[in-house]
Structure formats: C-alpha cells, structure tokens
Amino acid sequence: MNRTQTESYIDALNPRVFTYIQYADYTDRYPTHTVHEFPQAFYDEMRTASAGLFRIFCKAAEVLQNAPDDFARAMDLPREMLPYLRIPNAFRLPTWLSRFDFVLDEEGRIRMVEINADTPCFIVESFYANGVAAEYFGRRDPNAGARAQLRDFLTQIHARVAAPVADLTQGTLPPRPFVFSCFDDYPEDLANTRFLMQLMQEGAPHGDIRFRSFYEMEIDARGIPLTDNSYASALYRLHPMEILIDERTADGEPLGAMFLDLYQEGCFALMNPPEAILLQNKSFMALVHALAASEQFFTPDECALVRRYLVPSYFEDDFDALGDGRYIRKEIWGREGRNVRVVQKHCNEHTTAFEKEIDYADEVICRESRAAMYQDFIAQPRFVHTVDSGTIEGCLTLSCFMLFGTPSAVGARFSPAEIAGTEAYFLPLVTGS
C-alpha cells in the first residue's frame, strides 16, 4: 500500500479472484473507496424493469429473425452472420447471460441506455466484490444470494448441454467437456471467464469443465478438439461474435464461418448463442423504440414500459427528421464509449458538442461500424465519491444482470464523464433503509 492509499475494503478483495484491481498504469486503483446507497425499492425497480425489457427485447428479436435479410443488413449486421441467426438453441432465448445498463436522469429515474447481450463482463464486481464491500462496511448487500443464483443458472446450463450421456453400445459415459474460453492475456476477460467456470464446477462437481485459451483453440471436421482427444460439447466464449465472424485462418479461410458451420451442425453448444448479436447491435434499441411507437406490435403495457425506461433511440436514417436538441451518436458496434459523440441539432444542421476520448483505445477491440444510431441526451445528476487520489465528482452507470429471463445482481460504475468509458471506477452498491 503506498502513501496515497488508505486501508479500505479493497484490501479485503481476493486478488486471485479480482485480478484487475490495479489496471495498467492508471493512477488510481479500479474500485472506489466509498459505496453508494439506494433503497431496496430502487433495486426492485431496476430488476423489474430489466425483466420487462428482456421479454420485450426477445419479442423484438423474433421480428428481426423473421424479417428479410436486407433489413438485417441495413442494421449493419454482418452478412456472414445471417445464416446462423435462426438456429434454435437449448433454451430458446437469444441470449442466456446479459446485462442491462441504465443511467439516472435529473429526476433520479433510471433510463436504460444499453444492453450487453453477447459478452457481458462486470461479473466479478457485481457477484463477488460488491458483497465484500457491503460486509466490510456492515451494510446490506443488494446482491445477497446472487452468487448462488448464478451458480444454479450455470448448473442448469451444464445439465442441458454437457451432462454425460451413456453410450449403451460401449457401456461407458463418454466425456462431454464444457469449455470456457477467452484470450488469456487480458486480465478482466480471464478473471470473468474463470469466475463463471469455477461456479459451474461448484454446481456440477462431476462434470468435465475446463479452460482453454482462444490462442490455443482449434477446430476440425468434428468440432473443437481438446488435448485429451475429446471434443468440446459446449463452449463459453468471451469473444465478440461480430469479431469472430470475420476471423480467418493463416491460409485465408473463413474461420468464423467454419466455426459457426460446426455449431449449426450440432457439434457443440454456444454460450451465448450467435443470435445474441441481434440484441448487441445498438440499432436494435431503435427497432424496439420504433415498434413501441407504432403501438401495433407490443401490448399497451409493453409500450408503456418502453416509453418509461428505454431512452428514445433512433435509426441513423431518421436523424434528419428529429427535432432540435442534444443527441448521443453511437456507432453500431462501439464498445467502452469508443467514438461516442454528443451532437447539437438545430434546424437542418448539427454540430459535435463533445466527443468521447477513451484511455487505451487501441486495447478496445470492436468491429468497425458502417452505421450509427442516436439516442436522446440524458442530463445526469453528479455524485461525489472517494478514490485513491482523493474525492471526485462523477455520474453513475447502473447495471442489472439477467440469467435467462430472471434479473439477478446489480452493479455500478462511477465516471467523471457523463459518457462512461475505460476510465470508469467500480462503485459498490449497498441497501439503505
């Protein structure tokens, strides 16, 4: 501990679990020293809103799956992905593990701004570290029981896609390995992947559950071969589908398409399934907003829920028809705030009021976007919290994880900027009276 760091709950965090407490060469460690309090009713609302939005998003995903391919292409979905977006998966849901992100408006109401449906991180913070902080301060943890809930969720997945099946002809139980994979030189990805893997191992202690780096991953005509000559029955991949689909072998062969062909043939299950890319696409929020505005597809209650929680979202082609005001422009495949701009629209002209610059931009892996979408700009309240270097002001990004269609752990990040990026801190949440 250096002279600028005082003793806090951060010292109680297990560095073998939360391996990125100190990240890169940032002056401050990643967690804040202080916690943020909301009443239980606030967390209940976050979870209820997330569950309702999840049902609506799944309903809208069916619209996109049943639409002509030209519509998907207009939303900048990769052409190579189109054959794989209508394959039924084990749980008949477009995403199994997802995370809704919210901001607060000036009245303190939650407004949903994004969903990470493909490769959500922030798992270690929400399902582990938040509880350590709450216990340290003697406060109620809004995520009490969430770790067990996540373990049971993973156990259910294992039972469905990787439980041993007897080979009656041989009288054996052939291995059905469930493989967890990421690029293991990125600490956050590795820690989140291993956290999920270890919870599945707890829930299915007799299962064949193992880690394999994406750097070591191979495929052949039968699927994903492993070092003991077995084949993966299922794969958890912390690697964006929109990037995977474009990857090629050293010989120039379409590795992503070859990989998904094997999935389509039933060689292995995928978590999350390929159709998670539909919800991950940022213009999907514009589709949901447009369907709700038409009042012809969703029920009246669903339309009301979209109006209440989803920040008004628009396709790029509709921007010229919008009224004057401030909007946020987001690239379809942007991540970590990359290339996000605040634009001021007046009559038929618009100017850039602010452009997000993120730290370590070269390390943020994302697909180049050919299109963008817009959202209403939400002015946010500012709060004060303490970090290693002192007291700072900032805004909150609030998250709620979904395990299938069930809301689970909540979490918060704290950023000096209204548009959070890689500079954001982990801020533990506690429950007030």
Spans of model-derived segments:
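Preference for protein termini
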Residues: 1-433
